[in-house]
């Protein structure tokens, strides 16, 4: 969320407060008032949550940290683990996920064997593309691979979300058959690990604005 929270009064180039991560808990049928996540997840610079595992123990975040030589203005993708009631300090994702290009959104499948992320690095189809790394049998991760056609276009693809069924991918794109700006699409992975042609979720989920 972008709002004054006492952590910092700094604003970005558009005059907005920096993003920070908040949480709310469901009590009975109501949600509690949002609270600022404690350190070390938030810093005085921009930090946003990208993905929280189903068991609530693993978090991917996008944050600005000038201690690392990544992305424009030091923005990269970081990971944190929950240890009891506390979170570990965010550590930058390795395996060539972060580069000097722009890496933004990220998500994982239910079993944490596939990580999808967004990058405008060289080797893509144009704009921002969806990329992935896979966990290998020896426990290490593969090199990043562009998801390619039919997922990526010459325009921007963003915000991947892997459904718990293990085969359905939701993402946003200004390409494909967008009816206006970034639309939400879905694609399914078949038994031969090929992605189906993305389907626009249509109105009223997507609009012309």
Spans of features found by a protein language model:
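Short, conserved micro-motifs composed of acidic
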Residues: 1-209
């Amino acid at each position: 969320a972008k709002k004054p929270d006492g952590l910092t009064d700094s604003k970005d180039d558009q005059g907005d407060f920096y993003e920070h991560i908040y949480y709310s808990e469901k009590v009975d049928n109501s949600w509690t008032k949002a609270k600022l996540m404690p350190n070390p997840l938030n810093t005085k610079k921009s930090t946003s949550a990208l993905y929280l595992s189903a068991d609530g123990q693993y978090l991917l975040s996008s944050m600005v940290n000038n201690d690392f030589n990544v992305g424009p203005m030091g923005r990269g993708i970081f990971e944190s683990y929950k240890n009891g009631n506390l979170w570990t300090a965010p550590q930058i994702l390795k395996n060539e996920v972060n580069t000097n290009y722009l890496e933004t959104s990220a998500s994982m499948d239910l079993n944490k064997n596939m990580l999808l992320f967004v990058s405008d690095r060289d080797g893509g189809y144009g704009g921002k593309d969806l990329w992935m790394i896979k966990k290998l049998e020896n426990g290490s991760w593969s090199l990043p691979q562009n998801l390619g056609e039919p997922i990526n276009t010459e325009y921007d693809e963003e915000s991947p979300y892997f459904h718990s069924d293990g085969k359905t991918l939701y993402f946003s794109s200004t390409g494909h058959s967008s009816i206006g700006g970034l639309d939400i699409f879905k694609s399914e992975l078949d038994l031969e690990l090929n992605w189906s042609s993305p389907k626009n979720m249509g109105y009223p989920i997507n609009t012309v604005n």
